[in-house]
């Protein structure tokens, strides 16, 4: 770099340090939003496929009760446990709330998806200002509208046709 062209009396090292110190100082000066005290409860309903989850989130220690059982007992599959915990992880609220849920209908994947939506909606209800943008960006507040397509008359399944013989 030709420092004489920029400023003849300023050395190259001074130019580099001045730029780096300015950018780091401005990042530190940005005020960080303080999270409010975790004293509010939230309740919401989540749906996915045929499953319906009624969820209540209360300040606590991170205990999960699903249909009267622990989360690991109700969802033995680790993928379902991770899916349900995602809203807390993305908001850095692991262990800050207890979750009580009643789930009916559907299978394990649908129930896990319904529970995740219910938890995300509850966390959104608790603190809309801080949580909504993050949850929305991650797609946790969007209801997955995909359901099983119905069987049609004359077909074996929704789209599978019986074998066709030309002659």
Swiss-Prot record:
Keywords: Ribonucleoprotein, Ribosomal protein. Disulfide bonds: none annotated. It comes from the Bacteria. GO terms for biological process: translation. SUPFAM superfamilies: Ribosomal protein S5 domain 2-like. The keyword Glycosyltransferase does not apply. It comes from Renibacterium salmoninarum (strain ATCC 33209 / DSM 20767 / JCM 11484 / NBRC 15589 / NCIMB 2235). Residues 1-41 are annotated as: Disordered. HAMAP family: Ribosomal_uS9_B (MF_00532_B). Pfam families: Ribosomal_S9 (PF00380). This is Small ribosomal subunit protein uS9. PANTHER family: RIBOSOMAL PROTEIN S9 (PTHR21569), SMALL RIBOSOMAL SUBUNIT PROTEIN US9M (PTHR21569:SF1). Belongs to the universal ribosomal protein uS9 family. GO terms for cellular component: cytoplasm; small ribosomal subunit. Residues 17-26 have a biased composition (Polar residues).
């Amino acid at each position: 770099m030709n420092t004489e062209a920029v400023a003849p009396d300023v050395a190259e090292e001074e130019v580099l340090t001045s730029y780096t110190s300015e950018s780091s100082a401005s990042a530190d000066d940005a005020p960080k939003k303080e999270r409010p005290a975790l004293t509010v409860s939230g309740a919401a309903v989540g749906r996915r496929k045929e499953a319906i989850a009624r969820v209540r989130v209360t300040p606590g220690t991170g205990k999960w009760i699903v249909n009267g059982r622990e989360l690991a007992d109700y969802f033995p599959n680790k993928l379902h446990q991770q899916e349900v915990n995602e809203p807390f992880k993305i908001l850095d609220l692991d262990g800050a709330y207890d979750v009580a849920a009643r789930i009916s209908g559907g299978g394990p994947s649908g129930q896990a998806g319904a529970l995740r939506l219910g938890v995300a909606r509850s966390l959104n209800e608790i603190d809309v200002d801080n949580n909504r943008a993050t949850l929305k960006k991650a797609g946790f507040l969007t209801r997955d509208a995909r359901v099983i397509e119905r069987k049609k008359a004359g077909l074996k399944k929704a789209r599978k046709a019986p074998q066709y013989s030309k002659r």
